[in-house]
């Protein structure tokens, strides 16, 4: 999962990668891109081809998290219906020991400050519907629901 949702951001857009540490130990991060379409193009040319060779498309339609990620990797990410108004996107992950202590809000604030510095007008993200803690968190930090998909929700925030 890190090869898909973390590493390419650190390589291609390191100015939008922030790590949360407590007592010098990493326990969370927020990362993303200022331009989802441009980032997708770069990944299609420079990142995904090698990953697709390494992680083959599963033969079975088995509905596991790993298989879903592999199918995501092998489907070219070309549609960003909300990218005109919300061109940036982000991923955030915080270990349980650091959750519900205000660190998530602080990470989002740092990320958005950097987007403002880059003159980006909006940011979006996708979260699984079953992750109700995250859904509540994004609403709390000012994201609005843009679209409800089969298994996920797209949130956006104007800057």
What positions do the PLM features span?
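Conserved acetyl-CoA-binding loop-helix of GNAT-fold acetyltransferases
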Residues: 91-94, 100-114, 136-140
